[in-house]
Curated annotation (Swiss-Prot):
Keywords: Lyase, Metal-binding, Zinc. Zn(2+) 2 binds at residues 48, 50, 53. HAMAP family: Formald_GSH. This is Putative glutathione-dependent formaldehyde-activating enzyme. It comes from Penicillium rubens (strain ATCC 28089 / DSM 1075 / NRRL 1951 / Wisconsin 54-1255). GO terms for biological process: formaldehyde catabolic process. It is an enzyme of class 4 (lyase).
Length: 191
């Protein structure tokens, strides 16, 4: 039996609310918790198997979505935040004490610049967009999952109604490719 995909989806997916307007994320510290306020629901929420995203203990995947950068503000204990990996494209801000990643920001020229990556499981509020797909699924092998477990992992996602990809969803890959094409001088009509 495959280990936990993620606690938010192991027992099924709870639908979000289209009218949900955001909430607060908090780190796992017992006191003086870092608090980040999101003034928006997430988009492109998904299970991510990459090696960079923060995952709950025992989980193979993170659950991560994006919000506009201007919808994110640190509202308590900002001094406890630091960038986890300064070389990474996504500058993930984690709590120095408990290690939880509160948000990830892209500072350089990139198709996702202007969007911050967040983990809605860090919120007590309900209504966040439910996961839409699973990305970077094969990447869990690089983190120690046995290749023979992959069929079972993909079957669990399929049973949840989530398409699996070994990169991102087609819509996000199209966004990346459009950005790259435009950066190289290609122009498209009606964009």
């Amino acid at each position: 039996m495959a280990p936990s995909l993620h606690p938010l989806i192991d027992n099924g997916i709870t639908p979000g609310s289209g009218s949900f307007a955001g909430g607060k994320l908090r780190c796992h510290c017992a006191s003086d918790r870092v608090e980040v306020t999101l003034n928006s629901n997430v988009a492109h929420n998904h299970a991510c198997g990459c090696s960079k995203c923060w995952k709950p203990s025992g989980s193979l995947f993170s659950i991560v979505g994006v919000v506009p950068r201007d919808a994110v503000s640190v509202t308590a204990n900002a001094s406890k935040l630091s960038v986890v990996d300064k070389e990474a494209t996504i500058q993930r801000y984690g709590c120095k004490d408990c290690g939880v990643h509160l948000f990830g920001r892209i500072e350089k020229d990139h198709p996702f610049r202007g969007l911050d990556f967040v983990h809605v499981e860090l919120s007590d509020e309900k209504g966040w967009q439910e996961p839409q797909f699973a990305g970077f699924v094969s990447s869990i092998i690089e983190q120690g999952s046995h290749p023979k477990e992959m069929d079972e992992v993909r079957a669990k996602f399929k049973a949840l109604g989530l398409q699996t990809y070994d990169v991102l969803s087609p819509a996000l890959m199209d966004l990346i490719s459009t950005f790259t094409a435009q950066a190289s001088g290609i122009r498209f009509a009606n964009l």
